[in-house]
Every structure is written in structure tokens, then in C-alpha cells.
Amino acid sequence: MHLVRLLCRHKTALVIGTVCSFAVVLVFLAKCTSETLKQGHQDPPGLAPRAIALQSHQEHQNPPSPSKDFSAMLVVLITTGPKYTERRSIIRSTWLAKRDSDVLAMFVVGTQGLPSEDLQNLNTEQGRHKDLLLLPDLRDSYENLTLKLLHMYSWLDQNVEFKFVLKADDDTFARLDLLKDELKGKEPSRLYWGFFSGRGRVKTAGKWRESSWELCDYYLPYALGGGYILSADLVHYIHINVGYLKTWQSEDVSLGAWLAPVDVRRTHDPRFDTEYKSRGCNNKYLVTHKQSLEDMLEKHQTLQRDGRLCKEEVKLRLSYIYDWSVPPSQCCQRKDGIP
């Protein structure tokens, strides 16, 4: 009875205490549930690329400033093979010979699986010139050109503070002086500059055969791979999305597909003579593809002697201005009067 009287006397306090205790328990359970859900939650795979793209945009607005090994206004990356020593030598002595100090040029070679003799030769060449970008995780072959592109752009984004990159082949001749002058007037963002094609039919045979192209009956618009320029932010975009990018046989076609949904400035320029065979020689050309060693030497000597590219201007094929107002398959009507 004494206990009952005590309970009755203090029932208000007991009720309040019970309510408070219950509330504390509810808050604790809610917090635990929230933390558990937070730890167990994962974004659907389809959302991951967008999250990365948004992160990239934020980083572009407030870019980090980590210390990098190199700094340049313009980087030149030249894809080459382990045994093409003479081509590299000619390029060093011609269009790379008098480059400015803010131009960084490197020859890109995959070294995975190379015989010891080839590795030794490359190491000797590297010791002499210090301009080889050796990729130990890449087997150098035509079939791996697209992977080489991803490897070298990832390295570039991680190791060089730069504004623009010129991608070229070891049979390309470039006017670095003129390219640099024009780049000074261009915004260093969202730039994709070269000679574009939008009506390239999907190859079904030969070394360019694409066995898994499912996007369209034509290749998506792309700058031809003999020489083109990208701004640094697009290289960064490729690097951070590398795990999501599908690779095709042709590296230039692959790049065009990767950048197809991106808001970039596609700048078609007929002064980039970068098709599968040269259109000839024009003194306005900035980049010329499919050049023999003799062609490079002659162009360099003519520039040194006469201040112009061509000993004599020659037109082997007509060129075109890309018409962005029509479907890609109708983009490119060749006409006279275009470099």
C-alpha cells in the first residue's frame, strides 16, 4: 500500500519521465537508421558519369593547384613506334628544332613486351634527348592506338600544367610558330580544333574495321587524327571519365564519339591537311599529314630559305568547309578555292 501511495503521489513526474525516455529512444533509432541507409546506399550506375561530369565542372570553376612535373602553354604529343628512330630524328631537326621554351614536345611509345634490345635503344635515345613518353603498361601496336591515346592523355592531365595539346603522328609536319600565334587568341577551354569529317562510313574490313560500332550508320563528327588540338579541360574530361569510355579501332573516331555529347567548340579548319592522304602543299597549311622524311626536310629547308612552306604549291585533292547547319552525312562538299 505504501508503494501504491508513492506511485500515485508522483504519477505526474513518472509520466513525464517515461515520455522523455521514449522520445530519446526514438531519436537514437532514427539516427542509427539514417546512418545505416547512408552507408548502404549506392548511386545507380547510370548516374555515375553525371556525378563525375558535375565534379569536373566544379573543379574547372575552382581548379586545384597541385604541383606538376612540367608546365607549358602548348604540349605536342607525337604517337610513334619503338623502331621509328629516324622519323623522330627528322622531326627533332625540322619542325621541332626552334620551338619556344613554353612548348613541350614528347614522342609517345608503348614498351610492354618489347625485346630487351629495343628497350635498351629507347633508353639510350631517352638519355640523349629526354623527350620520350614511355608507357610500360601498353603494348605498342596499331590495334592499341586508342588505348595509347587514353594512356597519354591521362599522363598529360596528371603531370603537366598546360593550356593546349597538339596530337600528331610521326609522319606529320606542323607549323608550331603559327599555331602558337593563333592559340594566343583562343579561349583555353572547350576547344576541339582540326579538320572534321561527318560523313565517314563505318569500315567493315581492313585495319580500320570496326566490329562493335553501333551508334550510327556513319561515324560521329570527328577531327582527323593526323593532327588536331584540344584544350586542357577536354583532356581532363577524358582522363576522369576513362573508366566509362568505350574504345573503337580508330583513335580519332573514338575521340569524336567521346566528345559527341559534350558542349565543345568544334572548329573545322582546312589549313589542317590531316586526311588519310595529303591534299598537296599549300603555304597556308598549319599541319600536314602523310609526309615522308624527304617531304619534311624539303618543307623545313624551304621555310628556312624562303620563309614559306612549299617549294611550289600543289593541289592533289579538293578540300571543303564543314557545313554545321546540315546533317553530318551532308557536311562536306569538296570545292575549289579552299586550301
What are the residue ranges of the model-derived segments?
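Secretory-pathway lumenal glyco-enzymes, predominantly type II signal-anchor Golgi glycosyltransferases
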Residues: 1-339
